[in-house]
Amino acid sequence: MAGNRRIRVVVGGVFDILHVGHIHFLKMAKELGDELIVIVAHDETVKKRKGRPPINPAEDRAEVLRAIRYVDDVVIGEPGEISLELIKKLKPDVIALGPDQDFDCRTLKEKLRSIGLKVEVIRLPYLYKEDRAKTSKIIKRITEIFCD
């Protein structure tokens, strides 16, 4: 931390069925600064991006995330793609992207600069190689075990 200035890190995601990959991601993101704010994807955004509604509504996903020690605050995103206005309001120093998020770091950084924000955009590595750390794989295993 430079002087008394706190470094604010922002991440975003669905976080529908929380798993160990999410925890590793949040821990790594928190290590990039002093304060971690999570933007939880709006239910409509999940439906549009994943082709299915979320298992858990955004309010529940946010509540679960608030209980994680690495997370300082949680906000629910707006419907649609990344809201530059929301990011501007949150005033991050760093935006950490997950390894499976399909955003280009450079493009996002340029969009942020176009609205007057100088934000470092970092892609975090995928540390957990098992299928247990993918929500889609967890859903598949649940249906195989309980629906066959």
From Swiss-Prot:
GO terms for biological process: FAD biosynthetic process; FMN metabolic process. ATP binds at residues 14-15, 19-22, 100. Pathway: Cofactor biosynthesis; FAD biosynthesis; FAD from FMN: step 1/1. It is an enzyme of class 2 (transferase). Catalyzes the transfer of the AMP portion of ATP to flavin mononucleotide (FMN) to produce flavin adenine dinucleotide (FAD) coenzyme. Belongs to the archaeal FAD synthase family. This is FAD synthase. It comes from Pyrococcus abyssi (strain GE5 / Orsay). The lineage of its organism: Archaea, Methanobacteriati, Methanobacteriota, Thermococci, Thermococcales.
